[in-house]
Amino acid sequence: MAKLSKKMKIAVGLVDKTKLYPLQEAVDLVKKTSITKFNGSVDIAVSLNLDTTKAEQQLRGAIAFPHSVGKPIRILAITDDEKAALEAGADFVGGIDKINDIKNGWLDFDLIITSPKFMAALGKLGKLLGTKGLMPNPKTETVTDDVPAAVRAYKKGKKEYRADSFGNIHMSLGRVDSASNHLVENALALLDLIKSRKPATVKGIYIKNIALTTTMGPSLKVKLPD
């Protein structure tokens, strides 16, 4: 096991590993214990009681956070109405030409938004796009009849969420220099959404654990807000 740096030892020493921190206290402390020189990310991990081998328990969708989570994303809009997509804020626009660019190895974007018309062509790139989490999906509203509206929503801060194979959802809530109340409100928005999407087939405890951390800093266990 790698030795902890002096800064990390001090940061770890400020955290009570046996404590479930109220959300506001956790946010304040996780910002304080970030040890990066740059403006790191404040991240949340939510562990859910899901059996992801069952289709109805595979949580995936999109959330419009109340506050910016920081890093802007590069959007590729694959659409017939390129002008409207550009005006909405898309970084790249095109049709089959852009799909061919992807086929030839171009991946300088973070998100694809498209209309159903182009999904057959994109589907042929499933192995490439799927492994990188770039395949558009109706559940995340990245396959839509209104591409410009989706572009505007994602440019304003809408983000995809997805439970991994172990039932965990990991997301950034903002940056270390974000206002604490903004981080709290983003966390509450995500937790409220997760609660509202509880599959009917889940029995017993649904949200098992919540943790906050930064790009480089100790993890804090968080009490589920009422």
UniProtKB/Swiss-Prot annotation:
One of its GO terms (molecular function) is tRNA binding. PANTHER family: 54S RIBOSOMAL PROTEIN L1, MITOCHONDRIAL, LARGE RIBOSOMAL SUBUNIT PROTEIN UL1M. The keyword Ribosomal protein applies. Signal peptide: none annotated. It comes from Mycoplasma pneumoniae (strain ATCC 29342 / M129 / Subtype 1) (Mycoplasmoides pneumoniae). This is Large ribosomal subunit protein uL1. Binds directly to 23S rRNA. The L1 stalk is quite mobile in the ribosome, and is involved in E site tRNA release. InterPro entries: Ribosom_uL1_bac-type, Ribosomal_uL1, Ribosomal_uL1-like, Ribosomal_uL1/biogenesis, Ribosomal_uL1_3-a/b-sand, Ribosomal_uL1_CS. GO terms for cellular component: large ribosomal subunit. Transmembrane segments: none annotated.
